[in-house]
């Protein structure tokens, strides 16, 4: 998908970085890999380096409306959990309140995104809780752009940014499905 219009300068024809685009005031879907080791006895973080690794990008997007998407483990595993703890830790690390939304692309998530103002950040729930992302109803690679997750979230977003390189080898809607729908950086 060619990126045109006010997001980027007209002469940009190469791979884009955040330095190349103007995202201030825009709604950005931000896919991260914050899958972290958790203490099995209490769910506490044993290492939060993956959360720390996204602080720079979050600061770069400080004038945007940032919708954070991530996962923690897989269904059935002892460390599979919602993203509330990740949201809390990330809020403390960045020194800004990030709103946890216990939803991925349903009405609660859509309302939270629509109510955002520039500078706000929301952290959606574990994307692997959505059946199209992981599990029996996981969509095929060729159908990811028409999945519910991509269709709904791309309708309220201006761009997609990924720092989920640790999971980039996987086919799932939140990793590869947005490429045909909205500008991806």
Summary of predicted features, one role per range:
Residues 2-185:
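Active-site loop-to-helix "anion-binding N-cap" substructures in soluble metabolic enzymes
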């Amino acid at each position: 998908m060619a990126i045109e219009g006010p997001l980027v300068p007209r002469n940009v024809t190469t791979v884009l970085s955040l330095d190349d685009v103007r995202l201030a005031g825009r709604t950005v879907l931000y896919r991260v890999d914050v899958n972290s080791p958790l203490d099995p006895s209490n769910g506490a973080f044993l290492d939060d380096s993956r959360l720390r690794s996204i602080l720079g990008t979050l600061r770069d997007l400080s004038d945007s409306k940032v919708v954070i998407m991530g996962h923690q483990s897989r269904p059935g595993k002892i460390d599979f959990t919602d993203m509330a703890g990740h949201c809390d830790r990330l809020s403390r690390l960045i020194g800004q309140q990030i709103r946890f939304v216990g939803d991925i692309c349903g009405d609660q998530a859509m309302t939270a995104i629509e109510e955002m103002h520039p500078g706000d950040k929301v952290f959606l729930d574990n994307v692997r809780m959505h059946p199209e992302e992981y599990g029996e109803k996981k969509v095929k690679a060729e159908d990811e752009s028409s999945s519910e997750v991509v269709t709904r979230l791309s309708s309220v977003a201006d761009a997609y940014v990924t720092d989920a390189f640790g999971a980039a080898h996987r086919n799932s809607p939140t990793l590869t499905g947005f490429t045909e729908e909205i500008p991806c950086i």
